[in-house]
Amino acid sequence: MYDVIIIGAGPIGLACGIEAKKAGLDYLVIDKGCLVNSIYNYPLNMTFFSTSDRLEIGEVPFISHGNKPNRFEALEYYRRVASSWALNLKLYEKVTQVDQTGEGFRLVTERGAYDTKTIVLATGFYDYPYMMNVPGEDLPKVKHYYDEPHPYFGQKVMVVGAANSAVDVALETYRKGADVTMVIREPALLDSVKYWVKPDIENRIKEGSIKAYFNSEIVEIRKYEADIMTPEGPKTLQNDFVLAMTGYKPNFDLMQSMGIGFHDDEFHTPIFNADTQQTNVEGIYLAGVVCGGLKTNKWFIENSRTHAEVVMQSIKNG
């Protein structure tokens, strides 16, 4: 039986594994995807907002070419962290069920089962996109993740969303030769759009280089076109790809199945003790961005790295 199983092999999950090892705990880090799966799914040319030192874990220095590292450098860094600490990892193994036992918990996965005294959920949010729930969303042309602009050259691309991701995708695909239309539920772009980018997208929309439908939603998607509802009524647009940058959310289903409760607030914030990170279920802890519920801009790598030590000290002290 493990002392602790950490679900999620992102930066905070790895930090938890490191702190568990330092505390002398018998631990396992398990993830349904690859190492730092969320970072792997970032756009290929993405640069972090944070400087490299703020992304460091486990006393392993993060040296990047620029002041702020890119995706490639981050993947290299976290591989180096996992290797240098020889972390006990099981990747590409999805947890399908968690049951309480007399001594703790049993985690059932696609490959087997593991017994543990405690659990840390460090599952982040990037693996679970908000779905539009419209006919045709399951077509191959619909993407909830964006990697690079090249495939969209010369294509009619519909970008859904009003926040930073949607704006970045619209501008980048437009500049690489796509015919871009934005579909935005809100009456305007969100105030959270980066201040140095907002004038660019507003000017492109104003001049007509990028078309934008505000107060509008996608109704149905077909192979070569998409229906949208606008304030002026329904419209059918020719379309090759839909890039749904609608945001992401934590895996609430997993938390609820484990008995974790939630506050009655707009962010569906999970219940946990901020001093120990322990949830309302004794023996189950939260770490990282998952702590914020739907407020996914509250916790980042740089301000939640400390969760790992707090959790492991709480577990060690019983």
Residue ranges and their predicted role:
Residues 2, 9-87, 167-195, 264-265:
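Beta1-alpha1 glycine-rich phosphate/pyrophosphate-binding loop at the start
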Residues 5-7, 114-126, 160, 238-247:
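Short hydrophobic core segments
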Residues 123-176, 266-275:
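Glycine-rich dinucleotide-binding loop and its adjacent helix/turn
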Residues 137-151, 248-298:
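FAD-site-proximal beta/loop scaffold in flavoenzymes
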Residues 288-318:
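A conserved FAD-binding loop/helix module that cradles the flavin
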